[in-house]
Structures are given as structure tokens and as C-alpha cells.
Amino acid sequence: TGINLISLEKPGYNPVRSMFLDAAFNICDVDVLDNGININALPNNIKSAVYVNPSNQFPTGVVMPAANRYEILKWADNNDSYIIEDDYNSELRYFGKPLPTIKSLDKKDRVIYLGSFTSTLFAAIKISYMVLPDELSKIFDNNRNNYSQACSKAEQLTLAYYMSQGYYYTAIRKKRALFTKKLKAVTEAFDKYKYEGIELLNTNSGLFVTIKINTSTDEKLYIDSAKKLKIFTDYVEDISNSTQKCIMIYYSYIPLNSIDLIINILFNKWRLL
């Protein structure tokens, strides 16, 4: 393809960064704004690619508006470049109208679309998929025998049947309804028990919320407090600094009827740090 430069969202998903670095790509970090990646900061006059999470940016939860989706397509067309659209968890959007994927708006074959069933089904089924532009599809077909297929055919056929019978969409509706209630419970508990210097960032989609805390205390103490309550958390290094810590709380693992109590206990412990 003649591409050796990849633009990545900052903050972003670090395993993707490692993958591109291992493949010897040069990396261009581009800040994430309130409306998604800063399109004006993308490289111009050079063929490249950009990796984005438009439906639920990791880890900020920012959703790219429709206008920006058209704008990034314009950038790709003007610079003979590609957009890698990782649409993970796009089905798990709880509030507001669903937005069209960048791929569905693409008239110039500039989008590589990635999706996965890991979050919407369960992690044991490692089934993902990729929709390539025609030009790249031909390159892929010529090279695919050099790589092994990690997903079993039995699982793929089972999933195909599951979807053909409408079971998948029924499961998504049920999961979306449950997680909508869980997210609502989290935001209500946050409003009830929050303390000065703590801020909730993303409240529209996904399986986690991101919390920003104004503190110089070691983030490991916050993580350890959550772990003792059996809350799965993670630290967002790219957003954090010496006076501000950013932590993700995966509320999807917390029983609905326990969320209020657990958030209350967690915040009481954090106040003591």
C-alpha cells in the first residue's frame, strides 16, 4: 500500500500502538478532543492511515459526531489515505440516536472496518471481522495463506446460525437494556456520593465509565481499593499526571442491585487516601 505512517488517538488503546510498532510503522499521536480525534492535526500531503474509535473512543468514551465523520473521510480522500474504523462496542450505545458508521458513509473506498463479538457475546468466543476496501481486499487474498485462522469453523458456523435465527439481536437488546439500567445506576450513585475533585467523563456507551480525580496520591492505591471490593478497574496513564488521576471502572461486572452500595463504599475509601 505504500503506507508506513499510522496516526493514533491520544489517549488511546495501547495494545494497538504496540501492534503497529511491532510491524515497524511510524506513529503519529493525535489528540482526542470533545468531538473525537483532532482531524486538523492529521498528516497532510502524505499517504498514511488513521486508527479511530468513532462510536466509543477508548478510554474517553467520546462519540464522533456525523459532521466529523464526513470531515475525516474528506481528509482520507484528499491525502490518498485510509481510515481504520474500529467499531468495538458500537451496539452498546444507550442514549441518543445511533450514528452511521464511517464505513457506511464512505463513497471512495477509504475505510477499513473492524468489529468484534467479544463484548456483545462473551470473551471466550474470540470472533472478530474486517471489511476491506477492494484494493486492499485483493492484497489480503494474495497473502492470507501466510497467516493462520485462530477462530474455529464450528464457532463461526454456530454464530452464523445464532444470528440467522435472530437470537443475536435479541441478546443485544436484552444486554443493552440491562447495561442502560446499570449505567443509570452508576451515574445516580456518582451524583449522590461524589466528592470535590472527582469527575465522571463518559456516560453514553460502552462497558465502563472513566473517572478523573484531582489528587497527587499514587493511582495504585485507588486501584487496590477497588480490587478489594471486587471492582474491575484500570488506570488511564495518557490522561493522568502528577496532580490528576484517571481511572476506568467496569460497571458491567457489578450486579445491578449492588451498584449504589458499592459506589458509596468505594468513594468513602477513596476519600481516605
Where is each model-derived feature located?
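Conserved core of the PLP fold type I
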Residues: 1-79, 84, 91-92, 97-105, ...
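Active-site PLP attachment segment
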Residues: 104-139
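Active-site C-terminal subdomain of aminotransferase-like
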Residues: 137-155
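Conserved PLP-binding active-site segment of the aspartate aminotransferase-like
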Residues: 132, 210-215, 232-270
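Conserved glycine-rich beta-strand-loop-beta hairpin in the small C-terminal domain of fold type I
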Residues: 12, 176-187, 198-212
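Structural signature of PLP-dependent enzymes
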Residues: 141-145, 165-187
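Domain-scale detector for complete catalytic domains at protein termini or as standalone homologs
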Residues: 20, 42, 111, 125, ...
